[in-house]
Amino acid sequence: MGLLSILRKLKSAPDQEVRILLLGLDNAGKTTLLKQLASEDISHITPTQGFNIKSVQSQGFKLNVWDIGGQRKIRPYWKNYFENTDILELAELLEEEKLSCVPVLIFANKQDLLTAAPASEIAEGLNLHTIRDRVWQIQSCSALTGEGVQDGMNWVCKNVNAKKK
């Protein structure tokens, strides 16, 4: 197969689309994380009123990342976004029936701060070791510096691929 044939095949094969919900409490760094994934400027972040959506290419996937506001008044509306979700980011939503068997990625964000709890401590506090109905990962990261963010997205792509097979 020549180079031209390979390029045509790659161009004709559409990226598999994956929907990711980015949920968390207000001021957790969700929007910063989203902008970091999209390689956008993170110097001016304001609280999300409603939601933001960005599409990011990664490992043959088109990742449609939904950043849903975390303020108390918005949280009751989170359920409206659950349909067709491929990856879940917030451990508190494990009990939701619509999300059963959906892989869970928990970003232990703000690891650039001296006061940040280590990922192992967060995993223990959330009793993640008791999760048996799905795969899960806790990923140390700093949305501000970008450290650990791509590692988390690599895990997402690997596990969505496994789930879709």
Swiss-Prot record:
Membrane association type: Peripheral membrane protein
Modified residues (Phosphoserine): 5
A Pfam family that the UniProt record links to this protein: Arf
Source species, domain of life: Eukaryota
Cross-referenced InterPro entries: ARL2/3, P-loop_NTPase, Small_GTP-bd, Small_GTPase_ARF/SAR
Family named by the database record: Belongs to the small GTPase superfamily. Arf family.
Function description: Small GTP-binding protein which cycles between an inactive GDP-bound and an active GTP-bound form, and the rate of cycling is regulated by guanine nucleotide exchange factors (GEF) and GTPase-activating proteins (GAP). Required for normal cytokinesis and cilia signaling. Requires assistance from GTPase-activating proteins (GAPs) like RP2 and PDE6D, in order to cycle between inactive GDP-bound and active GTP-bound forms. Required for targeting proteins to the cilium, including myristoylated NPHP3 and prenylated INPP5E.
Protein name: ADP-ribosylation factor-like protein 3
Taxonomic classification: Eukaryota, Metazoa, Chordata, Craniata, Vertebrata
Gene name in the database record: ARL3
